[in-house]
Amino acid sequence: MIAMDRIARIPIARWTSRAFRVSAAARQTPMSPLEAHNELEPVYAAIDDRLNTVRSKLNRPLTLAEKVLYGHLDDPERVPVRGETFLKLRPERVALQDATAQMALIQFMASARPQVAVPSTIHCDHLIAAEVGAEEDMAKAKSQNKEVYDFLASAGAKYGLGFWKPGSGIIHQIVLENYAFPGLLMIGTDSHTPNAGGLGACAVGVGGADAVDVMVGLPWELKAPKVIGVKLTGKLQEWASPKDVILKVAGILTVKGGTGAIVEYFGEGVDSLSCTGMGTICNMGAEIGATTSMFPYNSRMGDYLKATGRDGIASLADSFSEQLRADENAVYDQLIEINLSELEPHINGPFTPDLAHPLSKFKEEVEKNGWPAELTVGLIGSCTNSSYEDMARSASVVKQALSHGVKSKSIFNITPGSEQVRATISRDGILDTFTEAGGTVLANACGPCIGQWNRSDVPKGTPNSIITSFNRNFSQRNDGNPQTHAFVASPEIVTAMSLAGSLKFNPATDSLQGADGAEFKLAAPSGDELPVMGFDPGEDTFQPPSDDSTSILVQIDPDSQRLSFLEPFPAWDGKDYTDMPVLIKARGKCTTDHISMAGPWLKFRGHLDNISNNMLIGAVNDENGEINNVKNAVTGEYGTVPDTARAYKAEGVKWVVIGDENYGEGSSREHAALEPRHLGGVAVIVKSFARIHETNLKKQGMLPLTFNNPADYDKIDSSDKVSLVGLKNLTPGEPVTMTVTKADGTSMDILLNHTFNDEQLEWFRAGSALNKIKIDLGT
C-alpha cells in the first residue's frame, strides 16, 4: 500500500512561464461574497507575475506548495531554498478565533495602527462550554462571556475586522464556507487553520504575534518548508472515509514527522474525495507537525464553491488551474503512496493522535492493552468532521439502527460545524434522526474537542473510553480526566460504535441485535456530498466591519479579571544569563495543553497574569514523576509550577525550562510562550520543538534552544544551576554554550543550537517582536 522515498520526481503537469492578465474593467470577482471590494483577479495576476520571476531564478518545476508560497513572496528576486531560506510573504487574509483573538488584538492595539492592513475576521467558537444542549449552553456562554464578546465586537468594528458572533460556528468551517479559495495564502491563530487546504489554499496556523505582523502591514516570515508528497490512487471503499487517510498518514509520519514541511496530496485518487473530505485531511495535518497541507484544485472544489455561492471564483480558478497544481516532474523531499481502494478504517489513540490501529485489528489491541472496552461517549462533529457529508453519512448509519429499533447505547453528542450546516441538516431531517436515536445536539462551537465540556456522566479519575471524530486526544484534553482513553476515528465509525456501546464492535464484520432479538449488520454508510436543496444559511450571525469607526471606543475595565492590556516586556540588558535554576525538567510529551491548559482556563486568555496561573501545570516533573509539583531552589520547598515561578520573579531570579522531544506540539496558543516570559523565564531548552511554539517563544523575547546532542537532556537535573554565556555574540547558525553547575559544585559545558535569523535576534534584543514593531513604527 505504501512506498516511501527520500527524493521523488512525480509526473504531474508540464510547466511553462505564462501570463495571467485581466483588464481593469474585468476585475469583478470578489475574494468573498462578504467582501465585494476585495477582488480576486489582481491576486491571481500577482501570483503569476511572482512565479514567472521565481521560475527564471530556479529553472525547475515547482510543487503546488511552492507555487502558492512563492507566488506570495514580498521579494521574488531572492532565490528560495527549501528547508533553508526564510521567506517574507504577503498573505491575503488573517483569521482569529476568540480565545487567541483577545491577546492578538491587545497586541495590535499597542501598535497604534488605525485599521488592519489585510482582510481579517474574528470567530467566536472557543468559549462555549458543552453541558446540556445547544440552546442552554449558548445562552450561558453569551452571559458568562459578555465582556469578552463585547470587547471583540467593538475591536472588530474599530479596526476593520469582520466579527462572527457566538453561534456562527467553528472558525475553520466558516473560513471554508466564506473565505477560502484556491491559491489563497492565509494565516490563522489556530493550529487547524490548514483545514482550508481542502479548497486549494495554503493556510497556516500561527501565534497571535505573527497575526499582528500581517495585520499591521508587515510581511509574514516563514522558513521555506520542505514538501512531503502523498500520492493517492484508487477509491475509498465501504466504511473507509477521508479521515482514514490522515489517520493512516499520522501513523506513518508520527506527531513530529511533518515538522518543517508542507504535506501535498496528489494523484488520481484525489478526484474521488469531496472538498470537505480534503479539508478533513488537511485539518488533521496539524497532528503530524506539518506547516500545512494542501490539495490541487479540481472539479470537486469547484462544486463546493458553487454550492456556497462562489461561482465566479470557481470559474476564475478554472482559468488559473495551471498554477493551482504541481508541475510535471515536481520534486518532493519525501513520498508516501496510499492506495485508497485498499485503505481500511483506522482508529487512533489513546493519548496521542499518531498511535494508529486498522479497524480489523482494533479489538485485539483493546484486549491486549486492557483499555476500557465499554464506550461511555461517542462524539461527532468538530472542525475536523462536521460537514454536510459527514453528518449525512453518519445519519445513514443511525437510520439503519432505528429501523431495527436500536438507539445509541453510549451517550451520543453531535456538534454541527457552522450555523449553515446546522440549519441545513435540521431542514433535511438529519438532526431529527440523531435525536431520535438518543443523540444530543451541542452548540455550533468547538466544545468538547478543546476541553469545553462540563462532563458529569463519569467521576474524574474513573477509567473510561470515549471515541470522537475530533483531531486531538491528548491526556485530559477533552474532559480533564487523565483516565479518559480518547480515540479518534471517522464520524461514521464513531456513530456505529456508539450504537453498539463498545470499542470491540467492528461495523464491517459484526452484527447488532435488533429490538426483536434478531441480529442485523449495518450496511456501509452513504450520503450526499452537498445538499440537494442547497445550503440553508440559517440565522445571520455576521457583523461586518464598520464603515465609520472613528467614534467607536474599545475599552478594558482596569478591574477586569478577563481582559488586561499587555505591559511591554523588558529589552535584553546585554548580559549573559547566569546561575539560573531549572524551574522544571519536563518528562516526555509536553504539548501546549500541558504548558497552558484550555478548558476552564480559556476565560482568562485576555488576561496574561491570571492565565499564567496555569503555566506548565500539566507537565510531568522528571525529578519526582509528579504533575505541578516542583522544588524551589531558593527555599527548598515544593509548590506548584506557577507559584514557584512567581516566587523566583519576585526575587529577581531568572529561570529556564528543560524539555523533551517535540516540545510544544499541538495548539497554536501563544499563551504557552507569553506565560513563561511573563513569569520571569528566559529560555526553554529541549531536544526538539514543534514549529509554532518555537516561533511563539522567539516572538516573546525568549530563547528557544535545542540540545546539540539530545542525550544531554539526561545530564540535566532539576537541582542544577545553568548559565547561558556568550549571548553578545549570538549569531545565526552558531551554537550557544550552556554551563551546568551541579549541586556538588562540579560543572560541565553543553552545546545548544538555535534557529534564529538576524531579524529574529532583533526581537530578542528588543524584548519581543511587538517591541521591535513599535520601535520600527515609531509608536
Curated annotation (Swiss-Prot):
Binding locations of substrate: 97, 190-192, 472, 477, 605, 668-669
Cellular localisation: Mitochondrion
Species lineage: Eukaryota, Rhodophyta, Florideophyceae, Rhodymeniophycidae, Gracilariales
Known cofactor(s): [4Fe-4S] cluster
Biological process terms in GO annotation: tricarboxylic acid cycle
One Pfam family from the record: Aconitase_C
Organism in which the protein naturally occurs: Gracilaria gracilis (Red alga)
Superkingdom as given in the UniProt entry: Eukaryota
Function, as annotated: Catalyzes the isomerization of citrate to isocitrate via cis-aconitate.
Annotated keywords: 4Fe-4S, Iron, Iron-sulfur, Lyase, Metal-binding, Mitochondrion, Transit peptide, Tricarboxylic acid cycle
Subunit structure, as described in the record: Monomer.
NCBIfam families cross-referenced by the UniProt entry: aconitase_mito (TIGR01340), PRK07229.1 (NF005558)
Protein name: Aconitate hydratase, mitochondrial
Binding site for [4Fe-4S] cluster: 383, 446, 449
Entry GO CC: cytosol; mitochondrion
PROSITE patterns given in the database record: ACONITASE_1, ACONITASE_2
Residue span of the annotated presequence: 1-28
UniProt-recorded Gene Ontology molecular function terms: 4 iron, 4 sulfur cluster binding; aconitate hydratase activity; metal ion binding
Annotated CDD domains: AcnA_Mitochon_Swivel, AcnA_Mitochondrial
E.C. code: 4.2.1.3
Pathway stated in the Swiss-Prot or TrEMBL entry: Carbohydrate metabolism; tricarboxylic acid cycle; isocitrate from oxaloacetate: step 2/2
